[in-house]
Swiss-Prot record:
This is Small ribosomal subunit protein bS6. The lineage of its organism: Bacteria, Pseudomonadati, Campylobacterota, Epsilonproteobacteria, Campylobacterales. Belongs to the bacterial ribosomal protein bS6 family. The keyword Nucleus does not apply. It comes from Helicobacter hepaticus (strain ATCC 51449 / 3B1). HAMAP family: Ribosomal_bS6.
Length: 137
């Protein structure tokens, strides 16, 4: 199996349910044709560098997957016939260096930063300290 990354941009006029349906459809195409999805990034709504089909914004998605080369033709065919796709690209990672870079991208996408613990306010800590001081005395 080869390592791939695909990025596609959906029209900004779609509602959330339609966006999820399109994303699930493309994931299903990859899985049905023997691919293994490693991770999927929803990059959200972003401004386009230039106007595409009278749209200035679009929903960006990136999918990292492993598959046989024959899957790419089917995936690109589905991208082309879907009118909600503004642009798409499929990138193949061939060399060992590229494959290790692909793996680091997948790891970075899967390891989302955890929220930092909030510090307790002095007001919250003070009553507890007073109670402990009173019980010790």
């Amino acid at each position: 199996m080869k390592f791939y990354e695909t990025m596609f941009i959906l029209k900004p006029t779609l509602v959330e349910v339609e966006i999820k349906a399109r994303l699930d459809f493309f994931k299903e195409v990859i899985i049905k044709n023997g691919g293994e999805i490693e991770t999927c990034l929803d990059m959200g709504m972003r401004n386009l560098a230039y106007e595409i089909k009278k749209n200035k914004r679009g929903y960006y998605f990136v999918i990292y997957f492993k598959a046989q080369p024959s899957l790419i033709l089917e995936l690109e065919r589905n991208y082309r016939i879907n009118e909600e796709i503004l642009r798409f690209i499929v990138i193949k990672y061939e060399s060992k260096k590229e494959q290790s870079a692909w793996q680091s991208l997948v790891n970075k996408a899967n390891n989302k930063p955890e929220p930092k613990p909030t510090k307790a306010k002095k007001e919250d800590v003070a009553p507890e300290a007073k109670e402990q001081a009173q019980t010790e005395a």
